[in-house]
Structure formats: C-alpha cells, structure tokens
C-alpha cells in the first residue's frame, strides 16, 4: 500500500455525470437484490446481515467508481 493510495481513498472525488448514472445503476441493482432477500428469507439475524452486506457492497462498489479503480 502506498501513501498515494491512502491519499486517494481519503480524498473527496466529485462525481462526473457518468459516475452518477453508474451509482444509480448500482443502487437499483442492490435494492432489487435486497428486496429479494427480504421477500424470500425468514426474519432472522442472517437476513439482517445479508441485507447489511448488500449495502456494504454498494458502498464499496461506489468507492471503486469514485476512486477510478485506484
């Protein structure tokens, strides 16, 4: 890990118009998956964890877009 990587990860990256479209697609896909989990899985700690991990996945995917894969 380099200082440049750390600096990149902790720097605000203003989204481009293309990024905004990508973020929306990621959120919509994740929302659909989370709804499927909600509909198909019984109420449980595992269901809650599964939906939380979908949310975490979206945040991590958004970070990859913002940081341009760096």
PLM features: residue spans?
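Short, compact, well-ordered microdomains
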Residues: 46-69
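Intrinsically disordered, low-complexity regulatory regions
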Residues: 1-46, 66-70
């Amino acid at each position: 890990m380099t200082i440049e990587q750390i600096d990149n990860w902790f720097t605000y990256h203003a989204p481009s118009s293309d990024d905004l479209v990508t973020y929306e697609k990621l959120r919509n896909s994740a929302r659909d998956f989370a709804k499927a989990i909600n509909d198909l899985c019984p109420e449980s700690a595992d269901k809650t964890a599964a939906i939380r991990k979908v949310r975490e996945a979206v945040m991590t995917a958004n970070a990859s877009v913002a940081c341009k894969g760096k």
